[in-house]
Amino acid sequence: MKKISFLLLLAIVICSIGWTDGQFTDVRCSASSKCWPVCKKLFGTYKGKCKNSKCRCYS
């Protein structure tokens, strides 16, 4: 029973990581490299990805 509880808790923690650290922008993109200067300008970090043709920046 402890093993199942531990695995369930671990799964919840892993699934909840990263839900709030990404910030969407209205800037359209075709590749993640297009988002890097946008994220640097808006949020001061080069960490960004192109998701659903929009830049998403991470802190």
From Swiss-Prot:
Organism superkingdom: Eukaryota
Signal peptide per UniProt: 1-22
Modified positions (Pyrrolidone carboxylic acid) in chain numbering: Q23
Cysteines joined through disulfide linkages: C29-C50, C35-C55, C39-C57
UniProt site (Basic residue of the functional dyad): K49
Intracellular or extracellular location(s): Secreted
Keyword Signal: yes
Keywords, alphabetical: Calcium-activated potassium channel impairing toxin, Disulfide bond, Ion channel impairing toxin, Neurotoxin, Potassium channel impairing toxin, Pyrrolidone carboxylic acid, Secreted, Signal, Toxin, Voltage-gated potassium channel impairing toxin
One CC-aspect GO term: extracellular region
One GO molecular-function entry: ion channel inhibitor activity
Expression tissues: Expressed by the venom gland.
Pfam families to which the protein is assigned, alphabetical: Toxin_2
Database matches in Gene3D superfamilies: Knottin, scorpion toxin-like
Site residues (Aromatic residue of the functional dyad), renumbered to this chain: Y58
Similarity-based family: Belongs to the short scorpion toxin superfamily. Potassium channel inhibitor family. Alpha-KTx 01 subfamily.
Main function: Potent blocker of both large-conductance calcium-activated potassium channels (KCa1.1/KCNMA1) and voltage-gated potassium channels (Kv1.3/KCNA3 and ERG1/Kv11.1/KCNH2).
Domain notes: Has the structural arrangement of an alpha-helix connected to a beta-sheet by disulfide bonds (CSalpha/beta).
Protein name per the record: Potassium channel toxin alpha-KTx 1.14
